[in-house]
Each structure stands twice: as C-alpha cells, then as structure tokens.
Amino acid sequence: MRAQFQLYHQMSFKMKKASLIIFLFFVLAEMLTAQIFNEKDKIVLRDFINKNENTASEDIGEVVAKAGKYFIGTEYVAHTLEVGDEEKLIVNLSGLDCTTFMETSLALARALKKGKLDEQTLVNELTAIRYRGGVLDGYVSRLHYTSDWVTDNVKKGIVADVTKSLGGERIVFNANIMSEKPELYKRLKNKPALVEKIKEIENSIKQREYYHIPVSKIEQAEDRIKAGDLIAITSTISGVDVNHVGIAVKRNGKTYFMHAPMAGKKVQISESTLGDYISGGRKNKGIMVLRPLEP
C-alpha cells in the first residue's frame, strides 16, 4: 500500500510538473508575441480579421489578393526588417515595403485558409515564408535575394513557380550585390564572416535553373496569370536578381499590379495593365510568376 501511495505521489508530481512546463511554454509564447506586435499592429490585425473571417473556403489566390487589397493606402516604409543588431521576426502592419507587403499578404491568407488567424499563427506563417527552411537562425537565414526566396518557398510547398509554363525563358541570376557592396547593408558592415556566408548563397543561386517572362512577352501571358499570383520583376542591374515584387489582381478581365512602390508613396494598384507597367521601367527585364499553394 505504501509503495502504491508513493507511486501515486510520484505520478501526481510528474503530471503537475508537465502541466507547469506547458503553462510556462504558453506564457513565454504570449510574451514573445507581445514583444513582436505593438498596439497599432494588434488593432490592424483585429480589423483585418473582422473584415476577412469568412474567406477560408475561397481559393488561396483570391484570399492573397483580398489580403493585399486590405493594405491599399498603407504607407511605404523602407528597411522595416533592419531593426536592431540581432535578427528577429518583425511584424509591421502599418508600414510596408514591397517584400513585406507580399510576405504579409501571403502569410495572412495562409492563416485565414487554415481557419486560425491570430497573432501567433501570423508569426508562424511569416517565419515559415521569410526564412530558409522556415527557421530563423540569424541574418543569413533570411531569404534576402528574391530568387533564393522562390527556390526555398517552392521547396517548402508554399508557392509553385509557374513562370516556365507561362512561356518563361531561361535566365541566370548573377546575384552578388550584397557581397560586392556590404557597406549598403547595416548588418554586413565590417563583418567579413557574414559576407562570406552570403557569397556561398550567391554562388548557389548562380548554379540554379530559373525562368522569367521577358518584358516583350508579358502581355501574351497576362490572361493565364491569376489573381493572387506573386510577381517578381527581374532586373537589368548588375548583381541584382529582382527589382521589385507585388501581387497580380484582376479588373474587368485584365491583369494589374498591386504593390508597395518607392518611398513616399502608398500601397496601390497600377493604373496600367501588368505588361504596360513592367515595360515602363527602364531597368525591368521581365517577370517571374509564383502561384500560392493551398496550405
């Protein structure tokens, strides 16, 4: 009987200990989320949820487009991910650059499709999208080059690269702007070890097979580009793979470009069609088209 009594207390202690660990885990997660989201972000997220809570049954592309449209009029803010000296997950719903606009719209859409949009789910989705293998492990783990972002998010099953099927042609990206001009990047200044790691990534990008649709052929592909497709504009600038990113939207059967343009402007939809918009940029070479996949 005494042995049974001791066993009971041992089991009871272990259960209490396990419950305490679980409780502390959730408390810690709550604290970390609170640090990531400021009060303004929380207000924006609650408003977004209220306006989009009945979209889970819709096609993922349509939900991405709706998420993007929610941010029309939001201020462009540069370097939103370069806060502090250490790499951490940044959520900024009130100021976006072109990349964070695209990533945030995709992350919100995936969370909606999963039927669980809250602060922690958004953090999880952004981490999965923004970092190599979905793991935040320092500055180099962030997918800085869009071409690298494409490869990794295709591998993770988050998007499909449909560029080739839309008439895309082979392109080689000699991406090296980060290693050649580290002084332009706050976290790379005077850090040769980090620059060497970036070089390794750049060399990998050069070896991969990529496709893009040249500017002259975009109009022919527009009908097959869907609402919510992610658009990456390839570059003629030496060392740069992609100039700009955004989201395709449809109006009256035509395709337009929704994006966060240069500093001083706001998230908007192009007045001209996608092909006309891209051809208007002297340094634009073509586009890659990435199709969001159902989570």
Spans of features found by a protein language model:
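Mature, folded catalytic cores of secreted/periplasmic enzymes
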Residues: 44-50, 59-65, 111, 191, ...
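Cationic-aromatic interfacial patches
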Residues: 36-103
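Short, surface-exposed secondary-structure edge patches
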Residues: 220-224, 240
